[in-house]
Amino acid sequence: LLSRGLGDVYKRQMWNLWHGCHKWSEGCRHCYVYRTDGKYGKDSSVVTKTEKFGLPLQKKKNGEYKIPSGNLVYTCFTSDFLIEDADRWRAEAWEMMRIRQDLHFMFITKRIERLQQCLPPDWGDGYDNVTICCTMENQDRVDYRLPIYRESPIKHKIIICEPCLLYTSPSPR
């Protein structure tokens, strides 16, 4: 999607439906969420549903959606969409994405091995309006995550090498 130059076509909107995370791998060592929350004395390891949870379906007084049609929605950038703590909210999040086919949702995960158990029943080979990005910060994580990611039923995929801790090859060893 973005790698094909389509990212410039979209207006962008942030949707942090839950906040907080648990450091999962070496790439989490200097997490910006932990760093930012630390400035305000907030515990980033506590995952909470945010007041913005229902944003994609919220409407203005005139009846128009608050997020206009055609936006690229950066989803869950202060957590991991597949984090276990959000299992109880995820079905509702998928439903909002299903309803808002006029938006394109994009999230990044380090927990790609949880995808199959977190997908909605009507997912099939993926929603047309969802891009799932997978972080692979070093060769160890490429070797582990890439085979899972390749086999996952996702229509739009982006590999994220951030933070890029060591040289990585796109081929598992």
State where each predicted segment sits.
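Conserved AdoMet/S-adenosylmethionine-binding subsite of the radical SAM
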Residues: 53-169
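Single conserved hydrophobic/aromatic residue that forms the stacking wall/gate
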Residues: 1-10, 167-173
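A structure-centric signal for secondary-structure junctions around beta-strands
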Residues: 6, 25, 69-70
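Canonical Radical SAM [4Fe-4S] cluster-binding loop centered on the CxxxCxxC motif
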Residues: 12-47
